[in-house]
């Protein structure tokens, strides 16, 4: 594994001599705009592995994306290689339809300590709840970013991530009926503690999420990528493109339903992904991602 090959994959040509916040932010932003959050392996007959070498080969050499346990594992390797103090953490994702957090840890994120300050670095959440910058680990402080206002709230050692959303302008609204468009203002994202984790602790969950019949990732094919001004996502056959703060503190949401014959071209042109095996899209879950 070669850090310069990783930098080429994410199109990063900046300095990396000093492990400071500015460099961390630039590398992070290049990563999320180059490496999709995706679970396409599940839907084209591949297994998602947690071994770092396999993840590196998939994302860096095959120019694929991955989900949290792949993206953030690779990102942790890159940051550690550059001299950053990185700790793996585990989170439970909020499920709006159930008004509850997951029963088990199902999300991997990173804590980076810089000059006695702790930051959460999460390059593997995807969609419209993807952070665009490292977030200082401080409770109750609004931290505005391009996607919206994020904040942490800490209670008895448990940290909660929330996002304050803008209103959304959806020109072709008839194509879209996610339950939360234009309805939620503040959305819970996930909870976590500061207990250090090892990648081995995620193996059982990694297997469960790609094999359980009721898993969101089994019932939805997902590919999302952050763009310079927003995010695009292909969920099943639905292509959603969001431009943040399009006008009057509103996000522009454009939605199109694709035909089967458009999928391969869309993955290549919109996400720079070429799959080795036949991809079978699916979207049978009622759980929303926006």
Curated annotation (Swiss-Prot):
- Give the record's keywords alphabetically: Acyltransferase, Transferase
* Catalytic EC class: transferase
Keyword Repeat belongs to the record: no
Does the record's keyword annotation contain rRNA processing? no
Q: Name one Pfam family in it.
A: Acetyltransf_2
Which residues does the Swiss-Prot or TrEMBL record annotate as the active site?
Answer: 68, 107, 122
Q: Which GO terms describe its molecular function?
A: arylamine N-acetyltransferase activity; N-hydroxyarylamine O-acetyltransferase activity
Q: In the Enzyme Commission scheme, what number(s) does this protein have?
A: 2.3.1.5, 2.3.1.118
Reaction(s) catalysed by this chain, per the record, are:
an arylamine + acetyl-CoA = an N-acetylarylamine + CoA; an N-hydroxyarylamine + acetyl-CoA = an N-acetoxyarylamine + CoA
State the similarity comment: Belongs to the arylamine N-acetyltransferase family.
Q: What does this protein do?
A: Catalyzes the N- or O-acetylation of various arylamine and heterocyclic amine substrates, and participates in the detoxification of a plethora of hydrazine and arylamine drugs.
Protein name (Swiss-Prot/TrEMBL): Arylamine N-acetyltransferase, pineal gland isozyme NAT-3
Q: Which organism is it from?
A: Gallus gallus (Chicken)
